[in-house]
Amino acid sequence: MPWIQLRINTNSDDAETISDLLMEEGAVSITFEDGKDTPIFEPKLGETPLWRDTVVVALFEADTDLTPTIEMLKTLPFLGEHFSHKIEQIEDKDWVREWMDNYHPIQFGKRLWICPSWREVPDPTAVNVILDPGLAFGTGTHPTTALCLEWLDSLDLSNEEVIDFGCGSGILAVAALKLGAKKVTGIDIDYQAIDASKANAERNDVADQLELYLPEDQPADLKADVLVANILAGPLRELAPLIAERVKTGGKLALSGLLKEQAQEISDFYSQWFDMDEAAHKEDWSRLTGTRK
């Protein structure tokens, strides 16, 4: 059965309101697309990431008359009578299959692969992490996650203790354990992140080596040989003294979640405690690494 697709150009402030109205008008699905090629931070679990320029895409059944819907939208003050939109007919597809077909095993560095559960691992002898994409968060597809995974792959983590600060889905924690770490401590402010990390560790048979804490519950004397923090520039600056305290002398640090233009300022700030390396970049994003003084 074909469908009618309505595309509306708007902004992040109004996208959710338009989405709700279109659902009331009978839309069977709503998705958001980037109106321009702009970077977006990884969202927290449960959040919907939106760009400043957002396209709301609604699907309606083929026999739907959209004339009343368009007239209603014209009355909205933030859209107006001549709002930008497009209506077209599209053929039916197996949308679940198409979504699954978009995800393939991805290699990071020399040893590490992140594989959806429905795909066969390309190299059974490699270090394989099984992780299914859900939210656009912590699946390896975001440049900041990729930068951190590549860094972990480059290290000898044998018998090392690791802290994953802002563990999210647990992808970095699980990868570190699969790469040989003796123990990983994951810390996150979100209960959903703690649950997701636990579930992904169980799926990869490393749950007994992973300890998970909310920030207020982390042990006061916690220290590690390696610490990775894939969060954002603001929290990285605010948490710098605590992060430094958590890394043993001579220990390794990786920071990501940074746009290129933010990297130098954060690197300079962390140089109080770490000998900082040159930044690594992927697309618009950066990763900083250093060694504890």
UniProtKB/Swiss-Prot annotation:
It is found in: Cytoplasm. Its EC number is 2.1.1.-. The keyword Transferase applies. It catalyses: L-lysyl-[protein] + 3 S-adenosyl-L-methionine = N(6),N(6),N(6)-trimethyl-L-lysyl-[protein] + 3 S-adenosyl-L-homocysteine + 3 H(+). InterPro entries: Ribosomal_L11_MeTrfase_PrmA, Ribosomal_PrmA_MeTrfase, SAM-dependent_MTases_sf. GO terms for biological process: methylation. Signal peptide: none annotated. It comes from the Bacteria. Disulfide bonds: none annotated. Pfam families: PrmA. Keywords: Cytoplasm, Methyltransferase, S-adenosyl-L-methionine, Transferase. S-adenosyl-L-methionine binds at T145, G166, D188, N230. GO terms for molecular function: protein-lysine N-methyltransferase activity. Its main location: cytoplasm. SUPFAM superfamilies: S-adenosyl-L-methionine-dependent methyltransferases. One of its GO terms (cellular component) is cytosol. Methylates ribosomal protein L11. Belongs to the methyltransferase superfamily. PrmA family. This is Ribosomal protein L11 methyltransferase. It comes from Shewanella oneidensis (strain ATCC 700550 / JCM 31522 / CIP 106686 / LMG 19005 / NCIMB 14063 / MR-1).
